[in-house]
Amino acid sequence: MAELSIRIGSIADFDLMSRYEHHITPEILKKCLSDNRILIGEVNGKFVGWLRWNHFWDIVPFMNMLHFEEDERGKGYGTKMVEYWENMLKSQGYFKVMTSSQQDEFAQHFYVKLGYNAIGGFMLHGDPLEIIFEKRFD
């Protein structure tokens, strides 16, 4: 299996990310890129996925998006990307991170496997329950 290379996205990646990131506006995408809040995964120089994050309550790093192309899933890249993100934040002095997943998404099992604990949830607009996960760096 080819090795995943992870790098911090920059504003130079705007055109690339615009082709894939459809959950946020172009303006927010530019802000995320300029604030170094997107990690880009590549294999042999080919884009395969990304992780986007923000801050919950302006304090706790919160992973908003982890996505890999369909044909790149199941190769351990998601685990490697999340571990890279966690280690980056630990080195910056953070003691915990958060994320979420709808109760009907497979991602909830992925996060539990990585040591995340469900700490609550909420429902919006009749969507399935959104489960909030936390991982502490003890």
Stretches with model-predicted labels:
Residues 42-44, 134-137:
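Active-site beta-strand termini and strand-to-loop segments that position acidic
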